[in-house]
Amino acid sequence: MAQEPSFFVLAYYHFTAIADPHQEVKAHKEFFKDRNITSRIYLSEQGINGQMSGKREDAEAYMKWLHANPLFETMPFKIHSHHENVFPRQTVKYRKQLVALDEDVDMNQTGQHISPLEWKELLEKEKRPLLLDVRNEYEWQVGRFDGAECPPCDTFREFKEYAENLKTQVNPEQTPIMMYCTGGIRCELYSSLLKKEGFKEVYQLEGGIINYGLKQGSEHWLGKLFVFDDRLTIPISQEPAPVIGSCHHCQTSNETYYNCANMDCNHLYLCCQTCVEKFLGCCCTDCQNAPRVRPYHHQDVHKPFRKRHHYFKDDLTSKQ
């Protein structure tokens, strides 16, 4: 019997000038004290980028608390229900960059936000803009908008090179682009990067895939959504989601992610149950023979984003 969804999972971001982000980190930690909340929240002089989960009453209190702060009073939240917390711990940190791009971008020159309804209408046009998925390759393998251009990038930093190559393949002044990501924040930066490369007409999906699923359902979407927490994949709406991913080893239809058991690889990949047992949780035979391999137990599927000392308590070097 399915457990009742008594928790909220929140996704949110907001670009705003924060004079003392370290103080905001302290304020968050003080507010979270004695509350049933787990999180991955980053603050900088640029603003906030957050994901958190907690009991409904705690999540609602947090949203009310943030909206009472003039810095965040207009910030929208994207909300999913769940039956438990989805992060391994409570993390609130200062970060110099809200998104790792290593490129100066002009936040006054970003793409035009379009609502999920406007996005759907654009997708249904006979001649629509170039549809661009700006997530990592391992993310779009399990789900994407139908007909999207999906760059084979493993990190967000690689998109700069992709943008430079794209403008040699199409006319940037005559090629409109509609881009999307999970929750919207990567599009803020990447749309600015595209404009810097000379693209004149750039649209970005407001609130990302999460918001589209909440407002428009699964129309024009294929598969599931990769998320950066212990759920790993979720349907974007209540509608059934077809499996479009395939096993890294045998190519059979699959949507289950694993981190390679070789701690020096830790590659995130899709794998079926047969192959994960055959390769003992590793992405290749070389990794099986590596010196730092997590123990594989078929009844104890490894959750993502765990450090070595989670498995080897005496491994002090990994805690450095």
UniProtKB/Swiss-Prot annotation:
Q: What is its EC number?
A: 1.14.-.-
PROSITE patterns tied to this protein:
RHODANESE_3
Reactions accelerated catalytically: uridine(34) in tRNA + AH2 + O2 = 5-hydroxyuridine(34) in tRNA + A + H2O
Q: Which residues form the Rhodanese domain?
A: 125-221
Question: Tell me, what is an example of a GO biological process annotation in this record?
Answer: tRNA modification
Query: What positions does UniProt annotate as the active site of this protein?
Result: C181 (cysteine persulfide intermediate)
Keyword field = Oxidoreductase, tRNA processing
InterPro entries on file = Rhodanese-like_dom, Rhodanese-like_dom_sf, Rhodanese_C, TrhO, TRHO_N
Gene Ontology molecular function terms on file = oxidoreductase activity, acting on paired donors, with incorporation or reduction of molecular oxygen
Coiled-coil annotated spans: none
The job of this chain, per UniProt, is described as: Catalyzes oxygen-dependent 5-hydroxyuridine (ho5U) modification at position 34 in tRNAs.
Q: Which family does it belong to?
A: Belongs to the TrhO family.
**Protein's recorded name:** tRNA uridine(34) hydroxylase
Q: Which organism is it from?
A: Protochlamydia amoebophila (strain UWE25)
Q: Which gene encodes it?
A: trhO
